[in-house]
Amino acid sequence: MQLATDAVGAQDRLRTALKGVGHDVVLIDCPPSLGLLTVNGLVAADRVVVVSEPAAWASDGVAQMLRTIERVRDRQRTELVTAGVVVNRLGRTRDARYWHEQLVASYEDLVVGPIHLRAAIAEASAQSLPLHALGQRAGAEIAAAEFTALLAQVVPDLSPKDA
């Protein structure tokens, strides 16, 4: 699919390609940047989950993304909803806790999750497996439960059988 090589209509290409797709939910995982691919995803989306990490400058990155979402909403005249800001890879360090608290303080109404840093997530990703497929491995069940809870928060109208 050619999305961003031609400037004319580039922002609408993904939305156009997804028209008529026979699915109730389509997850678009965008790169951690504010480039054309992310804008394509935002234009095609109905709701957005902003993913951040508990680190310095994270709040600035979230603010930039929220401004970009607002610009897309205004220019495309869409009903684009910010479903939440999720803090990903939340570790057990004092530094991680501090930056998580800063994000919560800045965006308290939007923060959902978090998703904790767990080896099971990296293991599932490396094996191209869903977390639920890791079974009894340490942390897999807890990590899967965090993602299930996050999904319920950001897509509350999705029934459990659809998840």
Describe these PLM feature segments.
Residues A124-L150:
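C-terminal boundary of histidine-terminating zinc-finger modules
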